[in-house]
Amino acid sequence: MTPEQTKRFKYWQTRTIIATMVGYALFYFVRKNFSLAMPGLEADLGISKTSLGIFLTLNGVVYGLSRFVNGILADRMNARWYMAIGLALCALANFAFGFGEDVSYWITGQHDGSQFTNTMILFMGIMWVINGMLQGTGFPPCARLLTHWIPPTELATKMSVWNTSHSIGAGLVVILCGYIMGTVGMNMTADPDAVAVSYTHLTLPTN
């Protein structure tokens, strides 16, 4: 490559690493917020530990299967759009999850009682399983983009840097959700989805 081509390649390589790091970290904002909200969901909405455990179990199983399926799909699609759309849909699933009480009222016409609670739990559980399915759109497109822009001689080093996105995302969501719960309550813990949605407009390099 000419010096100009090398310079341009390095620019897009750096941009790809940073953009995918930020994007993948934001997937934690719409996945780990549930664990932090669990005490509030139990205390404020009366959702049992058993139901919360089922939410987590189904989410984890579906997430694992989704990563496999989305790995196949991401190889056949535009990786930048695949990740951005997946993150946006995860945020929407989180947003819908936060309206569990309202949806239950619209369906049952009640503000409390077993029918209200069961409908709310069912709706929120479905939203969280859908979120688990969509979470699988995070890593596969990142892997495709990174292996495209990072040569084999640099891959281990730069992937080690990229892997800090896991810790960054997990750490920031604890701080943000902890602050939200401490100031405005459990019902706002789905608000990290707003951060995720705002990032999906970022233009990543083409495949």
Where are these regions (language model features)?
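Extracytoplasmic
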Residues: 16-39
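Residue-level signature of mid-helix packing/kink "hotspots" within the transmembrane helices
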Residues: 32, 60-68, 171
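C-terminal ends and interior cores of transmembrane alpha-helices
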Residues: 88-116
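Hydrophobic core of transmembrane alpha-helices in multi-pass small-molecule transporters
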Residues: 108-136
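Cytoplasmic helix-loop-helix junction between adjacent transmembrane helices
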Residues: 127-164
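Glycine-rich segments within core transmembrane alpha-helices of 12-TM secondary carriers
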Residues: 160-175, 181
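Conserved small/polar residues in nucleotide/adenosyl-binding loops
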Residues: 200-206
